[in-house]
C-alpha cells in the first residue's frame, strides 16, 4: 500500500512502525485476549502502559525532580482555561505574549477568569516574527507569563526560550519532542498530543509541584490540577488508547536516538524546504522572518490565488496531503513534525522546484 506524503497540521503523521505495532497488537494485547481499548484502566496491564508512557516522557525530556507529568483530556484548548483557573489567583496578573492565533485564544480565555496584560506582540506584522522580551516592564504582581513555543498557522517558533523573572508557562503542542530544552526553565508546559506525541485524545501537562500550593480551593474537581496529580491521572477513566499510542511514539523517539536526534532530522527537513523557497527568486514567498522560522510548519505563498489552487491540486495528485495554508495567512503550509520523513520533504521540494520552472 502506498502511503500519502502527510503534511497535515494536526492530527498529523504518525511513525509507520508505531502504526504497524498498534495494528499487530490491536486484537490481542500482551496475550490478554483483549485490545488495549478493552482493558480496564485499573488493570495491571494498563497500569504498566500508563507508567511506561510517563517514564519515557520523563527520560526523553530530562524532567527534573520536583515536577510531575499529567495525562489529561480536553486538548490544549482546555488548558487555555485551566492555567488561569489554577494559577491566576486574585490580585495577580497573567502576562501573555501574542505570537499567533493560539496565543490569542489562550489570552481570551484568561480574560474571562482574571486580570491579564499583553507584554509583547507581533500582531501588527501579522505574526511574522517572535517579539523580544528584553524591554518588558513586568508587573510586580505577575502570576506567570504565557508563550506559545511554535505557531502552526504563521510558521514561527521561539529559537531560544526567554529567561523571565516570573513563572514561564508554555503551550508546546506543536513542537514538544522536536528539540532539546531545559524543563526547569518552565513552571508549566502543556501539549495536545496530535502533532508530535501521538493521536488526538490526550493532553500532556508537565508542572512544577510547588504550583499546587497556590491553587485556589473551590475549583470544579476535574479542572483542578491537584485532582489529577494526586490520582496519577486516573481520577476518571483516562484516554487509554491514546496514552498507549503516546507510549509507542515515545519508544520510537528513543529508538531514533532521542530528542537531540529528532532536532537534527528536523533541521535537515526544514532546510530542504526553506532552500526551495529561498532559491525560487521570489516565486515562493515565506511568511515568517528568517530569524523566527519554524522547524515544524513551513508557510509560504505563491504569486496569486490561481497559481495556489493549481499548486495544491497538482500536489494532491502527486500524493501530497494537507498543504493548504490557514485562511488567515493563505498560501501553503507544510507541517513537518517528527514523524514526517526526510524523503517526504525532499519529494515536496522537488515538486516545488518543478512547479516553479513551469509557471514562473
Swiss-Prot record:
Residues noted as binding pyridoxal 5'-phosphate in the record, renumbered to the chain: 76-77, 102, 152, 171, 194, 236-237
Quaternary structure and partners: Homodimer.
Protein's name according to its UniProt entry: Phosphoserine aminotransferase
Gene Ontology molecular functions: O-phospho-L-serine:2-oxoglutarate aminotransferase activity; pyridoxal phosphate binding
Function: Catalyzes the reversible conversion of 3-phosphohydroxypyruvate to phosphoserine and of 3-hydroxy-2-oxo-4-phosphonooxybutanoate to phosphohydroxythreonine.
Chief place of localization: cytoplasm
Pathway(s) per entry: Amino-acid biosynthesis; L-serine biosynthesis; L-serine from 3-phospho-D-glycerate: step 2/3
Cofactor: pyridoxal 5'-phosphate
Record flagged with keyword Methyltransferase: no
Residues holding L-glutamate: 42
Cofactor binding remark: Binds 1 pyridoxal phosphate per subunit.
Organism: Geobacillus kaustophilus (strain HTA426)
Subcellular location(s) per record: Cytoplasm
EC number: 2.6.1.52
Modified positions (N6-(pyridoxal phosphate)lysine) in chain numbering: 195
Gene Ontology CC: cytoplasm
Amino acid at each position: 500500500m502506498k502511503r500519502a506524503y502527510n503534511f497535515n497540521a494536526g492530527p498529523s503523521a504518525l511513525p509507520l512502525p508505531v502504526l504497524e505495532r498498534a495494528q499487530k497488537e490491536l486484537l490481542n494485547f500482551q496475550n490478554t485476549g483483549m485490545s488495549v481499548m478493552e482493558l480496564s484502566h485499573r488493570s495491571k496491564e494498563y497500569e504498566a502502559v500508563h507508567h511506561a508512557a510517563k517514564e519515557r516522557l520523563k527520560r526523553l525530556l530530562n524532567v527534573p525532580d520536583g515536577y510531575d507529568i499529567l495525562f489529561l483530556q480536553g486538548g490544549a484548548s482546555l488548558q487555555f482555561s485551566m492555567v488561569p483557573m489554577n494559577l491566576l489567583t486574585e490580585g495577580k496578573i497573567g502576562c501573555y505574549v501574542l505570537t499567533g492565533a493560539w496565543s490569542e485564544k489562550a489570552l481570551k480565555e484568561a480574560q474571562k477568569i482574571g486580570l491579564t496584560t499583553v507584554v509583547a506582540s507581533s500582531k501588527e506584522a501579522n505574526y511574522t516574527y517572535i517579539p523580544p522580551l528584553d524591554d518588558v516592564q513586568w508587573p510586580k504582581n505577575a502570576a506567570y507569563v504565557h508563550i506559545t513555543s511554535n505557531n502552526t498557522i504563521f510558521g514561527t517558533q521561539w529559537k531560544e526560550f526567554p529567561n523571565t523573572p516570573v513563572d514561564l508557562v508554555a503551550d508546546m503542542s506543536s513542537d514538544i519532542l522536536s528539540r532539546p530544552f531545559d524543563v526547569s526553565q518552565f513552571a508549566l508546559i502543556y501539549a495536545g498530543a496530535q502533532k508530535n506525541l501521538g493521536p488526538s485524545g490526550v493532553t500532556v501537562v508537565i508542572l512544577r509541584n510547588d504550583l499546587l500550593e497556590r491553587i485556589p480551593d473551590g475549583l470544579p474537581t476535574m479542572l483542578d490540577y491537584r485532582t489529577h496529580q494526586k490520582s496519577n491521572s486516573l481520577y476518571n477513566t483516562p484516554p487509554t488508547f491514546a496514552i498507549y499510542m503516546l507510549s509507542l511514539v515515545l519508544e520510537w523517539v528513543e529508538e531514533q536516538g532521542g530528542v537531540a536526534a529528532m532536532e537534527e532530522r528536523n533541521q535537515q527537513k526544514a532546510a530542504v524546504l526553506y532552500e526551495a523557497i529561498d532559491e525560487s527568486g521570489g516565486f515562493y514567498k515565506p511568511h515568517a522572518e528568517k530569524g523566527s522560522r519554524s522547524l515544524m510548519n513551513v508557510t509560504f505563498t505563491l504569486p496569486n490565488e490561481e497559481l495556489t489552487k493549481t499548486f495544491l491540486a497538482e500536489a494532491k495528485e502527486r500524493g501530497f496531503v494537507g498543504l493548504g495554508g490557514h485562511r488567515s495567512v493563505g498560501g501553503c503550509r507544510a507541517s513537518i513534525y517528527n514523524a514526517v520523513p526526510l524523503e517526504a520533504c525532499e519529494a515536496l521540494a522537488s515538486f516545488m522546484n518543478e512547479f516553479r520552472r513551469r509557471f514562473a
